[in-house]
Amino acid sequence: MAENTVYFPEAFLAQMRAAMPAHLSFDDFIAACQRPLRRSIRVNTLKISVADFLSLVAPYGWQLTPVPWCEEGFWIERDGDDALPLGSTAEHLSGLFYIQEASSMLPVAALFADNPQPERVMDVAAAPGSKTTQIAARMGNAGGILANEFSASRVKVLHANISRCGISNVALTHFDGRVFGAALPEAFDAILLDAPCSGEGVVRKDADALKNWSPESNLDIAATQRELIDSAFHALRPGGTLVYSTCTLNREENQSVVQWLLSRYPQAVEILPLGDLFSGAADALTAEGFLHVFPQIYDCEGFFVARLRKTAAIDPLPAPGYKVGKFPFTPLKSREAAAVTAAANAVGLAWDAGHTLWQRDKELWLFPQAMEPLFGQVRFSRIGVRLAEVHNKGYRWQHEAVIAFAAPQRAFELTQEEAEEWYRGRDVYPQTAPQQDEAIVTFQGVPLGLAKRVGSRLKNSYPRELVRDGKLFAGKV
């Protein structure tokens, strides 16, 4: 791999020299920052087991090296990436894996280190969705996740990734993360705050990441981070777990933010050390029990992770003064819900008791039950999965519902050529058409969408915004 030419401000280098632990080499740090970042993926276990995924891609010649802290994570080397980008492979398009930097898998690994079974989790800064989808997989689509994103332009990307991965237990919000402590006090069993930061750890991916860097900027960012962690801590129930993480390397945005929380609530914060998180974690362990990952340690991005427990209740913040407005959905009565469920089952859609049916005008939605106590307390951008639209002849089943709730045994398998046509938004002409009028189409046993049979043709319903042009997947060799 060709080396990057990374811009390093002198003040940054001086700061890193001072922060570097004695057992690490500063020269190795500079050398690691100049090397291009290794690519990595995470298998989406909501759709496929790790073992089945490895068997599926074995013929492709991909070199997959396990990520020590995430059993679903792998560094990947493959030939032909220029000809066929990883994001255009069949397995990515159908949500079997997520392209995710290895370091960014650490916070969720820390959140679930003791195999907890949280009912309600918040991801405070969620876009583009790598950690939200990782949390959902660890929860098995059970319970509920509030995924918040402050940037309006990134909410759409967040939803697209959640939908592609077949996730049904997420509610999206679009707020400054500092509102939740007052709006949703003690509402969550676990919270991930992957805080906005100066990004010092991402220079291997972006050689110009430090162009606007300054010590003063770091201090300004740290002030915001303190407000975010304070809000998150108020939103956490006593006994719950908070993971604070950044992709930066300075102490002001990392250790100092956590120490500020400790000094503010000394009777209520307990550090949960991460030295046993995975084999080799001790190489990045700080004296406090945090992980401070310099790029040369594991040949990945720089990262910081702290895991905390809330041991006692704290004084609540003043109640917010805004009005949320009337909740625009109503739950379906049991008789109506039974009719919708039966119609969905007939086309091959099924869900568990952790989801309930709600209606807004002609739209039918499936909401995660675990989120219902929060309805009316904050305004949601989106909740759960849009199941269908009601029309004169029945129901128009929505693409995201097919991806989340399709039962593979009620499906019509496409050939590779037919699947490529499907992803290009074209109708499919199989040799033998399915018997039913509507059929869930699959490739590699994974749902791609719902097709309507018109004679010998399968009419494509793939959403226009997802249609792909150019070369798609290569198939088995």
From Swiss-Prot:
Q: Which residues bind S-adenosyl-L-methionine?
A: A125, A126, A127, P128, G129, S130, K131, E149, D176, D194
Entry's localization field: Cytoplasm
Catalyzed chemical reaction(s): cytidine(1407) in 16S rRNA + S-adenosyl-L-methionine = 5-methylcytidine(1407) in 16S rRNA + S-adenosyl-L-homocysteine + H(+)
Which SUPFAM superfamilies does the record cross-reference, listed alphabetically? Answer: S-adenosyl-L-methionine-dependent methyltransferases (SSF53335)
A GO term (biological process) for this protein? rRNA base methylation
Keyword presence, Nucleotide-binding: no
**What GO CC terms are in its UniProt record?**
cytoplasm
Molecular functions (GO terms): RNA binding; rRNA (cytosine-C5-)-methyltransferase activity
Where are the active-site residues found? Answer: C247 (nucleophile)
Pfam families in UniProt: Methyltr_RsmB-F, Methyltr_RsmF_N, Methyltranf_PUA, YebU_pre-PUA_dom
The catalytic activity of this protein is classed by the Enzyme Commission as 2.1.1.178
Cystine pairs: none
Q: Which PROSITE patterns match?
A: NOL1_NOP2_SUN, SAM_MT_RSMB_NOP
Key words of the record: Cytoplasm, Methyltransferase, RNA-binding, rRNA processing, S-adenosyl-L-methionine, Transferase
Q: Keyword RNA-binding on this protein?
A: yes
Q: Where primarily located?
A: cytoplasm
InterPro entries cross-referenced by the UniProt entry: Methyltr_RsmF_N, MeTrfase_RsmB-F_NOP2_cat, MeTrfase_RsmB-F_NOP2_dom, Nol1_Nop2_Fmu_2, Nop2p, RCMT, rRNA_ssu_MeTfrase_F, RsmB/NOL1/NOP2-like_CS
What is the documented function of this protein? Answer: Specifically methylates the cytosine at position 1407 (m5C1407) of 16S rRNA.
Q: Which family, according to UniProt?
A: Belongs to the class I-like SAM-binding methyltransferase superfamily. RsmB/NOP family.
PANTHER family associated with the record: 28S RRNA (CYTOSINE(4447)-C(5))-METHYLTRANSFERASE-RELATED (PTHR22807:SF30), NOP2 YEAST -RELATED NOL1/NOP2/FMU SUN DOMAIN-CONTAINING (PTHR22807)
Q: Name the chain's protein.
A: Ribosomal RNA small subunit methyltransferase F
Organism, as annotated: Klebsiella pneumoniae (strain 342)
Record lineage: Bacteria, Pseudomonadati, Pseudomonadota, Gammaproteobacteria, Enterobacterales
